[in-house]
């Protein structure tokens, strides 16, 4: 016998996977977007607060060291967001699929726990080969916190995916906010106590326990965490592997760019600290909320599976409009904001900030087309697009240009490769 969404079961029980809203509603409805949008705004503010406190507490040289760890953690957790994407797609797609009632089941949260443990072992075990090149200070503490923090984040990302797939947007937003607030609390304590670089490294990973707090305090979150999806664990892992590869490539551009910059530069120094801060400030207004709404976007594109290219138009127009305003604002008031907010040592030109904002728009568009590819189960095209964009950006960083110029060229032109790959694949599915 074949069944639809009811085939998703909780451990030891049978339940609908869609919460109170139902499968068909809520992905980009005003209520869910407002809740996730509010959570994204709070998350962005908290992220800015951590960056601000670190920049004020550390000189540009010290901030470049912190920025590399911040980027390294963003890189590995960005890759782990592939678990969020695949879990969202698996759970959400069940409303449109027929599955065998007596087939095998997968418990995504348990699988992600195994993935997290494996990631911890790989990072810690391989660290003697690369950590000396990446972490200039607090090397072994950085390795330990990177490994443990990633293990926790694998569970965090999967739980977000289960909440998104079941329309539990209030809990989805609460989990995001809990992560961000924990980080800023530790950063504020570091600023007051004077813990310097070590404290900000701790602050970076502190939010990785947020998933556990949500499970302890939220019954709807516990209900989502118990869900099982049809199919073998190997099937889930194959889909997740493509998403993780692509998400890892995207994370290099979105969060891990300071690491890529470090690996392609002899010495970052104070100039590198200014460039890293400029990249962070210009992209956060677009990419933080867009990343936070990955669950909404994937669910939306699954629902609009018959016209995926057309479904891209409205969000792409919104991103373009916000980006145009952002470019103007960055060019006019950006240098002044950097001097006033972070100190006279952080000097940046209007042109650099405006072009970096344009580069953020390119990455945002790539993120959007990538979400559509995931929703269409185009895992190979999704990963190929992001890997192509990352390789392109990495090669452009090797150009014999100034640090500022090659940063802009790499971040602006590299994503165009991936956008093209995604659009071609999506167009073929609509034929």
Curated annotation (Swiss-Prot):
<feature type="transmembrane region" description="Helical">
    <location>
        <begin position="197"/>
        <end position="217"/>
    </location>
</feature>
<feature type="transmembrane region" description="Helical">
    <location>
        <begin position="241"/>
        <end position="261"/>
    </location>
</feature>
<keyword id="KW-1133">Transmembrane helix</keyword>
<feature type="transmembrane region" description="Helical">
    <location>
        <begin position="143"/>
        <end position="163"/>
    </location>
</feature>
<keyword id="KW-0812">Transmembrane</keyword>
<keyword id="KW-1003">Cell membrane</keyword>
<feature type="transmembrane region" description="Helical">
    <location>
        <begin position="318"/>
        <end position="338"/>
    </location>
</feature>
<feature type="transmembrane region" description="Helical">
    <location>
        <begin position="381"/>
        <end position="401"/>
    </location>
</feature>
<feature type="transmembrane region" description="Helical">
    <location>
        <begin position="175"/>
        <end position="195"/>
    </location>
</feature>
<feature type="transmembrane region" description="Helical">
    <location>
        <begin position="33"/>
        <end position="53"/>
    </location>
</feature>
<dbReference type="GO" id="GO:0005576">
    <property type="term" value="C:extracellular region"/>
</dbReference>
<feature type="transmembrane region" description="Helical">
    <location>
        <begin position="407"/>
        <end position="427"/>
    </location>
</feature>
<dbReference type="GO" id="GO:0005886">
    <property type="term" value="C:plasma membrane"/>
</dbReference>
<feature type="transmembrane region" description="Helical">
    <location>
        <begin position="63"/>
        <end position="83"/>
    </location>
</feature>
<dbReference type="InterPro" id="IPR050833">
    <property type="entry name" value="Poly_Biosynth_Transport"/>
</dbReference>
<comment type="similarity">
    <text>To M.tuberculosis Rv1510 and M.bovis Mb3654.</text>
</comment>
<keyword id="KW-0472">Membrane</keyword>
<feature type="transmembrane region" description="Helical">
    <location>
        <begin position="358"/>
        <end position="378"/>
    </location>
</feature>
<feature type="transmembrane region" description="Helical">
    <location>
        <begin position="273"/>
        <end position="293"/>
    </location>
</feature>
<protein>
    <recommendedName>
        <fullName>Uncharacterized protein Rv3630</fullName>
    </recommendedName>
</protein>
<feature type="transmembrane region" description="Helical">
    <location>
        <begin position="111"/>
        <end position="131"/>
    </location>
</feature>
